[in-house]
Amino acid sequence: ISEANAHPQSSEEAAVVAELRAGATPVGTTPFTTAVLNGDVDNHADLAAAEALELPVEVTTDAKVIPVLWSRRLAEGLAGEVAFRNAVAPMEGSVAIAGHSAAHPDELMLALRGSGQALYIGLADDAFVIASEPYGVVEETSRYVRMDGETPSDPANANATRGQIVRLDAAAAGQVEGINRWSYDGTELPLSETDVVTAEVTTRDIDRGDHPHFLLKELGDAPSSFAKTLRGKLLE
């Protein structure tokens, strides 16, 4: 656990980081992207080696490969969701990813694959609310779309089509029309109002303690949760 490994991770590779620290203006950089990850990119080391990624030595999180690969795909001329999908599709493991590109400031990209994580897209007034469970959505809206990381769009080609890619457009924030969805192989998965779920939980069901938001409660609980995880596994 370190500041260098904190999320979001950026697409800046080692040479760019060194120039920035020296006060210089980087030359010939790739498009700037950022990403956050919940889950594990099991083959991140293999991807870094295969693509000859120049990662800062102090950054050891598997999440770093996401924005770097995405930036490289954009630099190769791939556009929009195609670049994002090509970056995340080779990643093995169960992942929930959110990414942002400076070239498209009004868009947010999401990816979900596997059963270990979840992503909910809340439809609020003029806003999308992204959370890993309904508790993170219902404070702002009771309506949401749940991404599906397991069901293949083509059962005959399950491995390539399992998982979903989503692009959120700020121009239609909070509306179904602002959500574009594809399977991992690029097959479009149209949305309609029938995909929208009304939450069965409300803010009354959320135990926030004295915290104003559930996220702050989770952050506050982190030390005790960490201690409980280690309990019985370490010797004095």
Predicted regions mapped to residue ranges:
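Conserved short alpha-helical segments that host acidic/polar catalytic motifs at enzyme active sites
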Residues: 1-236
